[in-house]
């Protein structure tokens, strides 16, 4: 049976993560209070941030930006989009 959490992002009880996503206090907070569904939303936001800011996961400064963005995404009103971000055009 899946571990259930009261998801901070989605505001309801849902299956929690099966792993601690970051090796720090923020990773523990996410593990304790973020659902798998909210994590999937984060992964899409994460890809956009990585591409728009041209970040490298191996760079300590890039990691700090990602931690700040994750903090805002999950525990604040939401993360801000990069200033020059243009959403992808839908095909059709």
Swiss-Prot record:
Keywords: Iron. SUPFAM superfamilies: YggX-like. One of its GO terms (biological process) is cellular response to oxidative stress. GO terms for cellular component: cytosol. InterPro entries: Fe_traffick_prot_YggX (IPR007457), Fe_traffick_prot_YggX_sf (IPR036766). GO terms for molecular function: iron ion binding. Pfam families: Iron_traffic. PANTHER family: FE(2+)-TRAFFICKING PROTEIN-RELATED. NCBIfam families: PRK05408.1. Belongs to the Fe(2+)-trafficking protein family. Could be a mediator in iron transactions between iron acquisition and iron-requiring processes, such as synthesis and/or repair of Fe-S clusters in biosynthetic enzymes. This is Probable Fe(2+)-trafficking protein. It comes from Anaeromyxobacter sp. (strain Fw109-5).
């Amino acid at each position: 049976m899946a571990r259930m959490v009261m998801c901070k992002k989605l505001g309801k009880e849902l299956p929690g993560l099966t792993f601690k996503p970051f090796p720090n206090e923020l990773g523990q907070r996410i593990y304790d209070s973020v659902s798998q569904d909210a994590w999937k939303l984060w992964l899409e936001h994460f890809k956009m941030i990585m591409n728009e800011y041209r970040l490298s996961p191996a760079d300590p400064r890039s990691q700090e930006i990602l931690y700040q963005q994750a903090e805002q995404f999950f525990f604040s009103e939401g993360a801000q989009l990069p200033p020059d971000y243009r959403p992808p055009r839908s095909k059709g």
